[in-house]
Amino acid sequence: MCPPEGDAGTGMVATNTVTKRTGNVSAGTSVFAMIVLERDLSKVYEELDMVTTPAGDLVAMAHSNNCTTDLNSWISLFHECLTSFGVKVDANELFSTLYNKALEGDADCGGLLAYCYHSGEHITGFTEGRPLFVRKSDSKFNLANFIRVHLSTALGAMKTGLDILTKEENVTIEQILGHGGLFKTKGVGQTIMANAIGAPVTVMETAGEGGAWGIALLADYMNNKGNLSLDEYLSTKVFKNSVAETIAPTKEGIEGFETFMTRYRNGLAIEQSAIDNLK
């Protein structure tokens, strides 16, 4: 028997992200990133939660309440439109087609802006939310940029929290493992995520396994660890031959996402106005 761990610790084990300078991102209805730190942070940040790996290493968590819900609503609208014309399309095919379309868009989403706030976001200071899509008259308004901006904004609040780590605390992130619905369409969520974080994002075939499997691995570790540390055990005994695909960020992609994030931060007043005036 091993003592039960919380979702954070078992999730780290299930995704083999217990080593310093690594982390994992779970992205679906909500999204959170957990980064294993090399040292304590210089101060407390209300935007970040602090947990530990099962081995006791410090982990910073950036958690966002909202991720794919708003994008799912838009894709449902496209499905309704097609159905109105008598076109039958498989839901999985529609998601895959539209997600892949996003990769044809501009790195900065063509000047478009969206917020996926169905509920509040503590990282950006909102106790409630209003889903929004905003553009200027000269923005590059096309399908590719429309889908891309909704994928990008799904990571906006989380990115705001991670920027505290990377830009204010100089935390190095060498690799991220992604899991959750955002990564279901091969390569798309990974690409957006890699450019958002500025680090390679890996998705393993076991990424769908969650905390229950992590608990089982911890129990097996307690029985069979020998002289191995937890990260050595996971790397050599569990994940040594795992199948994974990694996508690295690009200079253009990183710069484009940073341009989008400037627009995202500057537009938060629009979100606040919507909350104040749309009751």
Name the predicted role of every residue range.
Residues M1-L177, L182-K279:
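Active-site core segments that coordinate phosphate-bearing ligands/cofactors
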